[in-house]
Amino acid sequence: CVNCRPTCAITTGFSGAGAFSDGKLSLSYEVGGDLPTLIGEEFAQELIDYTDKIYLEFGADPHVEGIYTGEDIKEIRKNAIHAGLKLVDCPIRHLGTEKAQELYLAIQNYLADNGVEMRFNTECENIILEEEGCKGVLLKDGDSLLPVYADEVVIGTGRRGADWLEKLCAEHHIAHKPGTVDIGVRVECRNEVMEKVNKVLYESKLIGYPKPWKNKVRTFCQNPGGFVAQENYDNDLAVVNGHSFKEKKSENTNLAILVSHNFTEPFNQPIAYAQKVGELTNMLGAGHIMVQRYGDILDGKRTWAKELAQSNVKPTLKDAVAGDITAAMPYRAMTNIIEFIKMLDMVVPGFAANETLLYSPELKFYSNKVKMDSNLDTNIKGLHCLGDSSGWTRGLMMASVMGVLMGRKLAEKEGC
């Protein structure tokens, strides 16, 4: 990695990682985080339907994936139940990576044309607190700090800023609690293996609790004909992700398998824990994403580049380093992943093939959950938090919904 664009910029800027994701909009309140528990399931679904119309107005594809019924989906669900997995129904509106960038640029231009001032390449150092509450933010301006005052301050830093927000909460006693952090791998196999699931569901959302620990393990971000990608976070932390284009396709399907981790006491720094797992994996891969064949993991051996070259499954992340991801992945997480893959093989025969590829690390930094009420107010007057960094959402649609709700609440305060 030579820190080139867009690879190292895909988690920042307008719409954050959303513009460089493959743009999957989950159209069910059951997917995308815990916001429905805060505002109610029925209201959450109403907001999803409203927000979806906005996406359509800005050019989203009217076609919806995963709305098929009939014998095929019954068979998939039957196999999932037999395997001990729960299949979550969720229609998907797929933008595609290239279309997502166009759509979010259109939204950005619309906001700019309507008088919204945006500052890019600007670091927020801190918030301004007075006795009455939050009164603004401090921006870095060269060697000095520039105060920007406001009646209401909204923090929406995305997954990239989750660690920053956690430190801010600790410094200013913003009520929060350690949430869940997800540690896992990006799995890649041939399209032929996933053909039925891809056709019927497009994205299969499966949840299981494999023995012996029965931690929650789930599939996430499935990309038929997609590509595995690298994201770079602060401190040169390289993590793996996946995306798919609307037009350009590969011969493979990739998806994440994520193991949920919850910590209480004496340790309560889940983000730091996940970062250490990522740093250790990066060290073994000399700064690159590591990839290993599933069969080699079971055989207790590393994967070599020449073995990848001879495999049916060719890595779509070309600079991934063949090696041994088990040397860095915690035993509990690795065991959960292996057992979950065995369960998935009962739903998708061939998924647990020897040549199936596992890339590491895949980490989701939405751990810190800021305590808020249904009006999205924190314990500090005038301060609000949104999106994945708040700990309440996990994905494009639910984060967008939270933004819509926040906009309505602010408009109400202004008497609009």
Write out the residue ranges for each language-model feature.
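Compact, glycine/acidic-enriched structural inserts
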Residues: D61-P62
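Conserved catalytic/binding loops enriched for acidic/polar residues
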Residues: I39, F43, Y50-F58
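Charged, glycine/proline-rich intrinsically disordered loops and linkers
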Residues: L47-D49, Q310
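Residues forming the flavin
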Residues: C1-I39, E65-C416
